[in-house]
């Protein structure tokens, strides 16, 4: 099974704290290289529309070249690892747990270009990333009974999420939630079960209206949104063809403190009322008109290329976590 996601991000960051004295002879483990990499990773996490925050794993290459006038171009090749924090989770990525290998880890390789003005400290950031999970063969070789990653669109995954959400809504008098995104699904063994992770938001519908396909529910007005991230296990066989009805399940939902104006507040409107499974697998995601305000609707420039990122001394840098 092979999953591919491409993120194409373009935006502006103003007020950089980086020194105006930009070194051009950086090695991948230099402190300044780490600062540039952190800028790119921070931008990815602030504008990523789906799934999980990413953490830096390896700086594979860095090249700093003079551009026009006061501009300096920084080209980076980065390897990132998926964390367990959803993009809506306000937890700083530095405090997020890296998804362990036995839980079917996912890596992301990114080409980044940062245009830095040494006079104004203004930055333009361009990033293109491809995400790939560890192979099923490697997971099973190292841990034969570990859960295997499934597509968020897998019928068992979708049915499990809907089943757990319906059970929660039945128990919450006066509150109705809808799925914002199905972020992860896994097939577990001994006992056989389906493990799912998904984000939900409180809507302004009654329980009856929520089950009416002709009624469109909307998130509560600003300041009243209850957003939660849920992890659940539904115990059922992969051979089951019917939707779950009376299966045993375990679940835990944590309310996320997403403030109005938070960098990801746009995600609610991006997801609600649309197909709620993550498009991150077997798909390409590009910035379009509905992207966050910081995005510009144009393609990433062609000068993020190998000719700017030929191997340099001291690269790649050290592996901060593990290599897939």
From Swiss-Prot:
> Major location, coarse class?
secreted
Q: Where is the signal peptide?
A: 1-19
Q: Which CDD domains does its entry note?
A: CY
The record lists glycosylation at 204, 282
Short motif (Cell attachment site): ranges: 23-25
Which cysteine pairs make disulfide bonds? 28-315, 85-96, 110-129, 143-146, 205-217, 230-253, 287-291
Q: Could you tell me the keywords of this UniProt record?
A: Disulfide bond, Glycoprotein, Metalloenzyme inhibitor, Metalloprotease inhibitor, Protease inhibitor, Repeat, Secreted, Signal
Annotated site, Cleavage, chain positions: 140-141
For this protein, the record's InterPro entries field holds: Cystatin_dom (IPR000010), Cystatin_Fetuin_A (IPR025760), Cystatin_sf (IPR046350), Kininogen_Fetuin_HRG (IPR050735), Prot_inh_fetuin_CS (IPR001363)
Subunit field text: Homodimer.
What the protein does comes down to:
Suppress hemorrhage induced by metalloproteinases from the same venom (brevilysin-H3, -H4, -H6) and from habu venom (weak inhibition of the metalloproteinases HR2A). The non-hemorrhagic brevilysin-H2 is strongly inhibited by jMSF, whereas the brevilysin-L6 is not inhibited. Does not inhibit serine and cysteine proteases such as trypsin, chymotrypsin, thermolysin, and papain. The inhibition may occur by formation of a non-covalent complex between this protein and the proteinases at their metalloproteinase domains.
Give the protein's recorded name: Antihemorrhagic factor jMSF
Q: Which organism is it from?
A: Gloydius blomhoffii (Mamushi)
């Amino acid at each position: 099974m092979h999953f591919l996601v491409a993120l194409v991000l373009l935006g502006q960051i103003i007020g950089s704290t980086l020194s105006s004295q930009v070194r051009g002879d950086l090695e991948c483990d230099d402190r300044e290289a780490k600062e540039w990499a952190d800028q790119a990773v921070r931008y990815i996490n602030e504008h990523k529309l789906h799934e999980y925050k990413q953490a830096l794993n390896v700086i594979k290459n860095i090249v700093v070249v003079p551009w026009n006038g006061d501009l300096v171009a920084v080209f980076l090749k980065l390897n990132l690892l998926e964390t367990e924090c959803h993009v809506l989770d306000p937890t700083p990525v530095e405090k997020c747990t890296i998804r362990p290998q036995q839980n079917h880890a996912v890596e992301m390789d990114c080409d980044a270009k940062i245009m830095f003005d040494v006079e104004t400290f203004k930055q333009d950031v361009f990033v293109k990333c491809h995400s790939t999970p560890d192979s099923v063969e490697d997971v099973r070789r190292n841990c034969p009974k570990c859960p295997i990653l499934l597509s968020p669109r897998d019928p068992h995954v979708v049915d499990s999420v809907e089943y757990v959400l319906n059970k929660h809504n039945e128990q919450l008098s006066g509150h109705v939630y809808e799925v914002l995104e199905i972020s992860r699904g896994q097939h577990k063994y001994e006992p056989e079960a389906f493990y799912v992770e998904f984000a939900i938001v409180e809507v302004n519908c009654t329980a009856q209206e929520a089950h009416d396909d002709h009624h469109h529910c909307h998130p509560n007005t600003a300041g009243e949104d209850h957003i939660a991230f849920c992890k659940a296990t539904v115990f059922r066989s992969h051979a089951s063809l019917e939707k779950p009805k009376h299966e045993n399940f375990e679940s835990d939902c944590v309310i996320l403190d997403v403030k109005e104006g938070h960098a990801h507040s746009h995600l609610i409107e991006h997801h609600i009322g649309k197909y709620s499974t993550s498009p991150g697998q077997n798909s390409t995601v590009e910035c379009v008109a509905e992207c966050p305000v910081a995005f510009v609707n144009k393609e990433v420039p062609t000068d993020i290329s190998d000719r700017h990122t030929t191997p340099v001394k001291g690269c790649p840098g050290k592996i901060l976590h593990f290599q897939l």
